[in-house]
Amino acid sequence: MDIEKAASRREEEEPIVQRPKLDKGKGKAHVFAPPMNYNRIMDKHKQEKVSAAGWKRGVAIFDFVLRLIAAITAMAAAAKMATTEETLPFFTQFLQFQAEYTDLPTMSSFVIVNSIVGGYLTLSLPFSIVCILRPLAVPPRLFLIICDTAMMGLTMMAASASAAIVYLAHNGNSSSNWLPVCQQFGDFCQGTSGAVVASFIAATLLMFLVILSAFALKRST
């Protein structure tokens, strides 16, 4: 009797645990409903993508305009340098002094580099159009920023070297006994100076293009 009473007391003291009923059906999967704010989150994400595409399209349009201006400027610099020449008669018409860009290797390199840069900028316009049509696309923007950086370095190098030659032509160098020649070849020096200024403008525009592409890529990540 004591054993039966002790067993009954233990049963009364133990907590009652309800076991869950298992579904005996086979192949049934429980479907979890999405949270209540799921649609709201998706709508917010779509709105963010639309807004990002909007301002990136504006950046791409500005990129296209700057790229077109830079192409025209680089080609104008190359054409101006290539067509600048001046001839001075000395005593007779049979003995003349002539100045042209082929007399200086630096000027010849200037024409070649700016021609290459102008051609590249022209060929890169379709990629800029792709960025306008697909503002969220990363590969064309990445391609443009790499090539723009290389072309900016080439343009700056050619413009800086030619600027040094133009400076010597205007002012000379007393230490090296180099006399200024722009007093005699004024038109030639004006033409070369204008070409160098145009090349620096093209390099500056390329720098802005690199900054725009970097800004667009940063906001994409």
UniProtKB/Swiss-Prot annotation:
Glycans are attached at N173. GO terms for molecular function: protein homodimerization activity. Residues 1-28 are annotated as: Disordered. The chain crosses the membrane at residues 59-79, 110-130, 149-169, 195-215. Residues 1-58, 131-148, 216-221 are cytoplasmic. Residues 80-109, 170-194 are extracellular. The keyword Transmembrane applies. Signal peptide: none annotated. It is found in: Cell membrane. It is a multi-pass membrane protein. One of its GO terms (cellular component) is Casparian strip. Residues 1-12 have a biased composition (Basic and acidic residues). Regulates membrane-cell wall junctions and localized cell wall deposition. Required for establishment of the Casparian strip membrane domain (CSD) and the subsequent formation of Casparian strips, a cell wall modification of the root endodermis that determines an apoplastic barrier between the intraorganismal apoplasm and the extraorganismal apoplasm and prevents lateral diffusion. Belongs to the Casparian strip membrane proteins (CASP) family. Homodimer and heterodimers. NCBIfam families: A_tha_TIGR01569. This is Casparian strip membrane protein 3. It comes from Arabidopsis lyrata subsp. lyrata.
